[in-house]
């Protein structure tokens, strides 16, 4: 018989550990984990289920840039487009805007002359537009009266005879109290049933159910603001064999369904917005900049917010105008240039049909140039006709990286992609550095160090003159350093520029070219993957050939016996490195956490792997606690703390930019978690224990549900195990300060259950507690557990 009951408390800490034998781990680290997926070691204690992610913007990042209509008067089932640098494919869908309008749900006017049993009403003092279908209210007006005819804004006809005094104020409203029917005015184009509707605050998927005169009925009830701009579009799908792409001209001819009605023939230069793609395209880079994110996709760059996406690789050459009338052929004389247009720039000309491409770099003299163009001019432009540049080439870009800086009081971001010239962007103007030296053209890395931009290309490190971002003259303080090995990463650390190669780590100290000094940190350890380098908690984490390492450790102990900080999960790291073909990393600063995320085109989103580490000690690897992630599929990622808000974003090949640490699910999908303690011998592995009860201490952020299982004797094959136990922590509705409204149905006296007590059934020599959840519940922490047991006979 078992003896008197005893208790065994376990504090959950230490993270994932897999480099110990099961019994060693159970004896020496009972609070650690043998499995820890989608839980994070928390700086507040315990293991916390990770937060989810959501779409940063509900639309896909445009895969083909900002293509436009190439030639007016097109209709039917074919369409020529231009300013497209990647070929569309069969099955892609795109949207054409065919009409715009403003919401005009409310208007007022004053009766101008007594109305006596008449349907004719004269008004003045109008505010807003009166349109047919509006309901009319005011003193003396019967219920249900509507406007049937608008002769003009001062003379209307209503649906029944009325007697209204002079100077009575009348109010005109859209007739639908459910807000599916709205009145619109200032209509441009033709609105038709079935069209897609977009505008500020309108969710995706809203369409036109019907239209009668100025009254538009929508598929979804919406409360639309007065004067809101509405856009009405049709969605088209590219048919089989429906793409003819001209790579040299950056144009395409599309065949699609349904057809474009002649009434909705688009104008030259109108936008063609692709809404979905049949093929996947990798996001090549994402960099948080101010309150937006700069995203590289295929051959273009975009500025993305939660509500809009704007192409930024649009050159700014000044106010460019046609210089002289009667020009024809394949050249165009222009003036007003502040810099030289480049080959493959794309532009349109006011008053001239078609879209045009610059076929050779221009030479500018006194602001003027003769542009070589294709195709030949469709017609002769007028003198001083405006030239509008649509995009400049960023073709064949590789992984795109960014550096933020501010030398003049204006925030800027530098952009490199390993192929094209570097570019600068200040949230308004995009500048390609077309005149950089060969050693900078095609740079793969860029950082801001000592108020100079440093560019890494192959084995060369080139820097601008101090406080400049485009001066590469030696006399001004620019220079180039040869490293003798290919650069794999750059980072600023402790007022030094740290330079990584595959086999060494170097540091550049000093302030200017006059005292810059390159010194080795180590010559036999390097970084094998560029995008794993991050500063976290006063150290620099990076992926070495045998695992994750900390630069501070290297700096302190030189070249001898450098151990990696991920040795406690060496098996998982080795598998992670071998399974994935590319890596991205981010730092979550308020958690002192580093995340490295793997990418492989053959691994689905739900199986995408990652490793996270939380740093508990001030510096060094001794305080790192690890866990694994599943379901965060990232090819590129970035994080930044700006104006007290930390933004963490990532992207892959599904078209969307995602925001990490946002929400309770993975973009609508459940978060699946597992945490299993070691197999604990509880004092003596040779003595059988009978398990009676468990007390689980948690810290939830809302109503949650999860399962707990007791696994006995190393869960050996064919062994009988106790059934799992389900925990749910809410006995009623729950409200949190700041999120619930007074007067709602929330019960403020209801508290979340944080201590769970449950009976245990089973006996064995060792025991492990396993927790699992598969839900969209809010995050929760598992802090500690106390197990009641009795001792039986010795084995």
Give, region by region, the residue ranges found by the protein language model.
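Blade/loop signatures of beta-propeller domains
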Residues: 33-48, 457-472, 510
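Small/polar beta-strand repeat architecture
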Residues: 67-279, 312-327, 335-340, 346-401, ...
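Asp-box/WD-like beta-propeller blade repeats and closely related beta-sheet repeat scaffolds
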Residues: 426-447
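Beta-sheet repeat architectures centered on beta-propellers
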Residues: 2-68, 78, 276-312, 393-408, ...
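A short beta-strand motif characteristic of beta-propeller blades
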Residues: 276, 313, 390-393, 431-436, ...
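Hydrophobic or amphipathic alpha-helical targeting/insertion segments
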Residues: 403-433
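Surface-exposed extracellular loop regions of Gram-negative outer-membrane beta-barrel proteins
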Residues: 497-522
